[in-house]
Each structure stands twice: as structure tokens, then as C-alpha cells.
Amino acid sequence: MSEITHRTKTRPVKVGPLTIGGNNEVVIQSMTTTKTHDVEATVAEINRLAEAGCQIVRVACPDERAANAIADIKKQISIPLVVDIHFDYKLALKAIEGGADKIRINPGNIGRREKVEAVVKAAKEKGIPIRIGVNAGSLEKRILEKYGYPTADGMVESALHHIKILEDLDFHDIIVSMKASDVNLAIEAYEKASKAFDYPLHLGITESGTLFAGTVKSAAGLGAILSKGIGNTLRISLSADPVEEVKVARELLKSFGLASNAATLISCPTCGRIEIDLISIANEVEEYISKVKAPIKVAVLGCAVNGPGEAREADIGIAGARGEGLLFRKGQIVRKVPEETMVEELKKEIDKLAEEHYAKLEAEKAKAEQETQKA
């Protein structure tokens, strides 16, 4: 089973039923590609994202039609809704009134102080946080004039400026992002931000590219940041179906042991010893475990001689040979199974492990409730 890597502790901030920061796990976020005023299409996409493992979803709110749709969207989805606002404070007020769980603004772009005060007052009344979104591509003119071009120091200065506006209004339910398309700049900005303030950080490499190139670029940048214990939520930004963003995010978090609700596949790269169709089997198993909400490590290996030993860390796995497969747990062979049924046998064992995990969680939940009642 996976173990959660140590996180840099930050101030906890509530987003709907979730708590971002503190000692909580990194939360996966994505953004819809639909026109927000098209409620039916937007809800359908959000529900697809939630099924894939998305935990928070953001929608664009460029106009009043989009703002008016927030309430209808909110009623039909099961995950927290973030509304993206640029410049028009009235749209922020409508989004908050419509049930947004978080809004993303830059207070300095909203206009006069009374406009910012109105947004902060509404957010306070509803108990929702504000995300300050700093982007290297849209830094304030004064910052660019001071530094000459986008720098990590300039990005942090911008963040601190917007944070101060909110803090001066006694508002502290803040989440901050420091996005850049340049990987090295993003890494430096997030490192410096993590030392400059204790608000939770939303991670992202912006404009990262298409499915393949963007996955590599995001994994390189966000992987480096996560490895330093920095980050509380993240989005993989891709020019692709947003469901792919969620899939990549889950895999990235699993790589660092940061996902306690996802199964992981281990499979060998294939060689001349293989006597089964390992690639298609691995793909089938990967698809099967994509919906398993338990931290199980599953191995699919092509060599019965070295397979079990090579996957000692796996909770369950198969190693194929001519006409049969070896089913094993923690590197120990459990039994031999015919080749034609070995994938189905593996799936049954995966289901058993998942059920054991779910039962354990329910028992822990029941125990916690009993202790709460006693207190």
C-alpha cells in the first residue's frame, strides 16, 4: 500500500467539504472546456471528470450568462465548484450567490477598493475561499518595469501584493497559484512562494501543450515541485480532453506516494523471454484499476522466472508463462492459473483487496464516530 510523502505544512483552507493544505493530501483539479452558460454540456463534462477522479473543478465566468448558470450547475454536480473571474466584480458576486465553493480572482484587477470589499464581504458570508492566480504571462506593468521580464521574485511580489489586499480586509481563506509555462521559472516561483507565506499552493504549468508533450512538461515541472514537499492542489493543463488531465494528475501523485485512493500498475517493458501478450494485458488491467479507489499496487509481468521477485513491493500480480500464469502476493506465489483466465483471476484478487480496504475505512470511520459521541 502507498504511504503519503511528508508535506510542507500550510494553513488549512476549506473548499466545500474538502480541506486544502494543513496535513491533507494533494487534491486534483481540472477545468471545463465547455461554454459555462451551456449547463447541460458543462454538467456532463464535470460528471465525467468526477468519475475519473477529479476532486475540484473550475469553470470560466466571462459574462453574465455564465454567472447566472452557476446555481443550476452546482445543483447537479458532486464536487466543489471554482469560478474563474477576471475584472468584473459583479460576476464574482453572482457566482458566490449561485453557490460557488471558491472563486479565482486577482483583487488588484477588480478595481476600486469598495469593489474588492464587496467581493470579500460576500465570500466571508458564504464561508468560501479566494484563489489568487499569479501568472508569469500576465504580471502587472509595474512588476515588469521593475524586473524587466517575468521572474520568480516578481511573481512572489505580485502574490504578496494581492494577499495584502485581502489581509487588510481581514480575509485569510486564501489559496495561491504561481503559474508559468517555463518549467524552471515555475519551480523557482513555487519554491520562493512556499517560503514567503503559508497559504496553500495550487500547482500548475500553464500552456504546457498537447497530451504527450504537455504530460512530459507538467510531470517534469510539477514532479520537481512535489518532490520538495510543496503543493496542496494541482492541475495538469493540457490541450486535450480534461479527463486526460485528471488521469495524468493521478499517475503523477501515485508516483510520489501522494494518492491514498488510487491503485498503481507495475508492468515490465517486455523482452524476448515473454510468451504472453503482455502489452494488451497491462493495458486492460490499467483500465480496470483506474476506477479502484484503494492504494493497491498491481503487477503484470511477462516472465515467470524473474517476475515475482521483480515485484516484491506489489500487493498482487501475475507473471505469465507459456499456457499459464503465476498469481502472487507480495512476491510470494499463491497459485498457478490457466493463461486464458489469469486476467480475470487477477481482477478478482484486486476486488478482494479493494473490499478489504473499503471495509477498513468504514471500521475506522465508525470508530471515530463512536469516540466523538462519547466525548
Curated annotation (Swiss-Prot):
Gene3D superfamilies: Dihydropteroate synthase-like (3.20.20.20), Sulfite Reductase Hemoprotein, domain 1 (3.30.413.10). InterPro entries: Dihydropteroate_synth-like_sf (IPR011005), IspG_bac (IPR016425), IspG_bac-typ (IPR004588), NO2/SO3_Rdtase_4Fe4S_sf (IPR045854). Its EC number is 1.17.7.3. Pathway: Isoprenoid biosynthesis; isopentenyl diphosphate biosynthesis via DXP pathway; isopentenyl diphosphate from 1-deoxy-D-xylulose 5-phosphate: step 5/6. Its cofactor is [4Fe-4S] cluster. Binds 1 [4Fe-4S] cluster. Disulfide bonds: none annotated. [4Fe-4S] cluster binds at C268, C271, C303, E310. One of its GO terms (molecular function) is 4-hydroxy-3-methylbut-2-enyl-diphosphate synthase activity (flavodoxin). It comes from the Bacteria. It catalyses: (2E)-4-hydroxy-3-methylbut-2-enyl diphosphate + oxidized [flavodoxin] + H2O + 2 H(+) = 2-C-methyl-D-erythritol 2,4-cyclic diphosphate + reduced [flavodoxin]. Pfam families: GcpE. Keywords: 4Fe-4S, Iron, Iron-sulfur, Isoprene biosynthesis, Metal-binding, Oxidoreductase. GO terms for biological process: isopentenyl diphosphate biosynthetic process, methylerythritol 4-phosphate pathway; terpenoid biosynthetic process. The keyword Membrane does not apply. Belongs to the IspG family. NCBIfam families: ispG_gcpE, PRK00366.1. Converts 2C-methyl-D-erythritol 2,4-cyclodiphosphate (ME-2,4cPP) into 1-hydroxy-2-methyl-2-(E)-butenyl 4-diphosphate. This is 4-hydroxy-3-methylbut-2-en-1-yl diphosphate synthase (flavodoxin). It comes from Bacillus velezensis (strain DSM 23117 / BGSC 10A6 / LMG 26770 / FZB42) (Bacillus amyloliquefaciens subsp. plantarum).
